[in-house]
């Protein structure tokens, strides 16, 4: 598992091929954000909270770890979905880049694997784990995700 800073420092070593990534969070970080952790997968003392896929792992990890939260990204909705959700829970807005960076540095780590079958692998991971921050194909944490979706929309409006 790697920290946000490690990913940014090693970004050129990450291949531009498909794969699946998994974001883990400390119990303290989840508590701070109000993220439910019941029955989540635990690895190295961290809780698995989000799984994603990409056809270009370098680009996707750079996006999640270093997105600039530009007004144009906020307006168009192209801000990293993970960062949207973290920002919503931290500040009620989408323009708090520093807050998200600091939170990720203190409370989150990511691991990834390359795969030609990344779509199938991601679906398998979502179905096999309880993931509070995943929306698509996720039957778990319905109430939390519904409330987060409402708050996320308001956070975007608060940032424009």
Residue ranges and their predicted role:
Residues 1-160:
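Boundary/linker segments flanking structured domains
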């Amino acid at each position: 598992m790697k920290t946000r800073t490690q990913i940014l420092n090693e970004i050129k070593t990450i291949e531009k091929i498909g794969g699946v990534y998994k974001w883990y969070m400390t119990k303290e970080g989840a508590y701070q954000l109000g993220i439910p952790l019941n029955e989540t997968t635990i690895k190295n003392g961290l809780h698995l909270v989000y799984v994603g896929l990409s056809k270009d792992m370098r680009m996707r990890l750079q996006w999640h770890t270093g997105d600039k939260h530009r007004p144009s990204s906020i307006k168009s909705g192209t801000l990293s979905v993970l960062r949207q959700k973290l920002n919503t829970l931290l500040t009620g807005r989408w323009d708090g880049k520093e807050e998200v960076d600091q939170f990720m540095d203190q409370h989150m780590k990511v691991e990834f694997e390359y795969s030609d079958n990344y779509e199938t692998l991601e679906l398998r991971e979502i179905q096999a784990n309880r993931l509070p921050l995943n929306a698509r194909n996720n039957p778990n944490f319905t109430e939390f995700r519904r409330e987060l979706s409402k708050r996320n929309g308001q956070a975007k409006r608060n940032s424009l």
